[in-house]
Amino acid sequence: MSLRTTPRSPAEPGHLPVMLAEVLTALAPADGEVIVDGTFGGGGYTTAILKAANCTVLGIDRDLDAIVRAEKMAQANPRLVPLLGCFGDLDTLAEQAGHASVDGVVLDIGVSSFQIDQADRGFSFMKDGPLDMRMGGSGPSAADVVNTMSEKGLADVIFRLGEEKNSRRIARVLVQRRVQAPFETTADLAAVVEEAVGGRRGARSHPATLTFQAIRMYVNDELGELARGLRAAERILKPGGRLVVVTFHSLEDRLVKQWLRERAGAVPGGSRHMPLMSKGPAPAFELQENKAVQPSEKEVETNPRARSAKLRAAIRTNADAALDEASDGMNLPPLAELEKSR
């Protein structure tokens, strides 16, 4: 499951900010600046940013528990401004807080350790709890998805977001089982998925890992939120502003990589046989590195959850922000359809 290793409080054992040194280097906070931490979590990045410079941090999270932590931290450090909401709306949230532009944005994508560790949030099959998985607590839950979505819809979600090769078989078994009794707990779902794929057979990870990941990503529209967050950052960043994104899943990294390449002026379609007729719009970003930065071997030894992390960073130019609409490219059934059926 795409675990955001962090969330991220250096003060709490087991919650380590991933690639903290690399994030600070790419973000380069300076005195007097305004930085957006779009995924506040446990405040690990925010704490380090506030220590690195006499700046203001807008700590955004859609999880109310995270905002409660942020508000407690803000009592001791008024340079932190907690903002409840989705990072896909970070430009609107920043403007509502009185900041028409900002100097830096950092996004740490995925579910947090705090969320995983709370059984009642329903994110993990390691701790039995209600089948929920909602980061923000509103909208259709994982139980709604599993109990009402069509077999084809479930198979598509599990295959595209989980990259699970047994997606059709799993979807078929889930639909057959829910006729007898609806799914209500994480342990129940995990057991049925394990049975559907034939048990563990010595596998390093639980057979339900990819299915849980897919359903969680769908429930929270994580790729759509990421696409919206990137565009919001483009709109709110000043020229010279830094965008830093840490991902833990290949789908997330692919989306960030392709979007940054396009925004940095890499227009697809040209070749030496058929040159481009137009160079496209002026680049809105300059890449800090051509390739993703990965955690050091030492960090992975200390924090194994950091193993899959990739960091991509770019600097905003003075070009106008693009006006295209955000898309995750998955073409999955919209959550709104489930909302209507509830």
Swiss-Prot record:
Keywords: Cytoplasm, Methyltransferase, rRNA processing, S-adenosyl-L-methionine, Transferase. GO terms for cellular component: cytoplasm. It is found in: Cytoplasm. It is an enzyme of class 2 (transferase). SUPFAM superfamilies: Putative methyltransferase TM0872, insert domain, S-adenosyl-L-methionine-dependent methyltransferases. The keyword Metal-binding does not apply. Residues 322-342 are annotated as: Disordered. It comes from the Bacteria. InterPro entries: RsmH, SAM-dep_MeTrfase_MraW_recog, SAM-dependent_MTases_sf. S-adenosyl-L-methionine binds at G43, G44, Y45, D61, F87, D108, Q115. It catalyses: cytidine(1402) in 16S rRNA + S-adenosyl-L-methionine = N(4)-methylcytidine(1402) in 16S rRNA + S-adenosyl-L-homocysteine + H(+). GO terms for molecular function: rRNA (cytosine-N4-)-methyltransferase activity. Its EC number is 2.1.1.199. Gene3D superfamilies: Putative methyltransferase TM0872, insert domain (1.10.150.170), Vaccinia Virus protein VP39 (3.40.50.150). One of its GO terms (biological process) is rRNA base methylation. Pfam families: Methyltransf_5. PANTHER family: 12S RRNA N4-METHYLCYTIDINE METHYLTRANSFERASE (PTHR11265:SF0), S-ADENOSYL-METHYLTRANSFERASE MRAW (PTHR11265). Belongs to the methyltransferase superfamily. RsmH family. HAMAP family: 16SrRNA_methyltr_H. Specifically methylates the N4 position of cytidine in position 1402 (C1402) of 16S rRNA. NCBIfam families: 16S rRNA (cytosine(1402)-N(4))-methyltransferase RsmH. This is Ribosomal RNA small subunit methyltransferase H.
